[in-house]
Amino acid sequence: MGLIVDTIRMQYLNNVRMDLEYKIQLITQTRSELMTSCNDLMQVGNDYDSDNPIVKTLNQRQAKLKLLDQKLEQQMLQYQTKLKMVETEYNSCRARVDKNIQHAFSYQ
């Protein structure tokens, strides 16, 4: 019975792992796009005088983008931590399955 439960648990954990990896990938992609946007704002801002109101608006937008990037980084760290936990539990289930299989097929 433990073998079946552990096998089902492993399938569930594998699905959770794939979901977390996908979310991490999306966040990484979004952060890359944010950095590109920040760099574009910096390049546009360099064309204007520093006292120009447009530059102030661009700096505010850049600050908002950096704040969003920090939030995404925190979210990604949370997902990475959850992923490590899932992988640890998956390995534990895998070890129990291997032990149950070895015990089932050993002749004593």
Sequence positions of predicted segments:
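Amphipathic alpha-helical polymerization modules
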Residues: 1-108
